[in-house]
C-alpha cells in the first residue's frame, strides 16, 4: 500500500544521486500484470494510460506531495547529489536503516522505517566523525520533511510510523568550524581533493 510507496520513494531519492518514477507511482498503483508478476498492469510499458490526478488527490491516493518535497530537499542539499559520500550508521532495529551523506558543509542524515505495516522504534548510533563532528558533540538537526528541529548527538531515539512519519531526512547544522571539506569529497568524480 501507500506506506511502502512512501518509504521506497525516500530511499530512492536519498540513496542515489539520480532518481525518477514511472507515471502512476505517485498514485501507488500496484496491480500486477498477472498473478505473481512483478510487472504492473498499468506500467505504460505497453500503453498510455490517462489518470485522474485530481480525484486521486481528493481521495488521498497520491504521494505526489511527498515526491515534490523530496525533489525540493534534493535541490537544497548538494550532499544528496553524491554517491561515494554515502555512509551507513548503526540502528538497534533491523527494520530501521540510517545513513548519511556529507559534501563540504552540507550534511544530511536519513533514517527510514523499512516496515510499511508497523511502527518501528530504534536507537540510531551516528559515526560523528563522518559528519565532521567531535565524539561528544550535540547539534541541532532539522527534519526536512516536517520542519521539526531536534538536538542529536552520538545516540538518538527515533519512532517512525508508516503513513504518518515513515522517515526523517535531517539536515545537520554543522558548527561554523566544522564546514571544511569532508574526507569523501575528494573521492567524487570531478571534485578536486586539494583545498
Model-derived regions: residue spans:
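Carbohydrate-interacting/catalytic domains
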Residues: 2-8, 16, 21, 25-195
Amino acid at each position: 500500500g501507500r506506506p511502502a510507496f512512501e518509504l521506497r520513494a525516500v530511499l530512492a531519492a536519498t540513496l542515489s544521486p539520480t532518481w525518477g518514477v514511472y507515471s502512476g507511482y505517485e498514485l501507488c498503483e500496484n496491480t500486477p500484470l498477472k498473478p505473481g508478476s512483478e510487472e504492473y498492469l498499468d506500467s505504460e510499458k505497453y500503453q498510455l494510460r490517462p489518470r485522474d490526478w485530481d480525484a486521486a488527490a481528493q481521495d488521498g491516493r497520491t504521494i505526489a506531495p511527498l515526491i515534490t518535497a523530496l525533489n525540493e530537499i534534493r535541490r537544497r542539499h548538494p550532499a544528496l547529489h553524491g554517491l561515494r559520500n554515502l555512509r551507513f550508521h548503526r540502528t538497534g532495529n533491523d527494520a530501521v536503516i540510517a545513513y548519511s551523506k556529507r559534501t563540504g558543509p552540507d550534511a544530511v542524515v536519513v533514517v527510514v522505517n523499512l516496515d510499511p505495516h508497523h511502527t518501528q522504534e530504534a536507537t540510531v548510533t551516528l559515526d560523528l566523525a563522518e559528519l565532521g563532528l567531535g565524539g561528544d558533540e550535540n547539534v541541532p538537526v532539522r527534519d526536512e520533511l516536517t520542519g521539526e528541529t531536534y538536538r542529536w548527538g552520538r545516540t538518538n531515539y527515533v519512532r517512525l510510523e508508516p503513513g504518518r512519519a515513515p522517515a526523517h531526512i535531517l539536515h545537520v547544522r554543522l558548527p561554523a568550524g566544522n564546514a571544511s571539506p569532508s574526507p569523501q569529497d575528494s573521492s567524487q568524480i570531478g571534485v578536486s581533493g586539494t583545498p
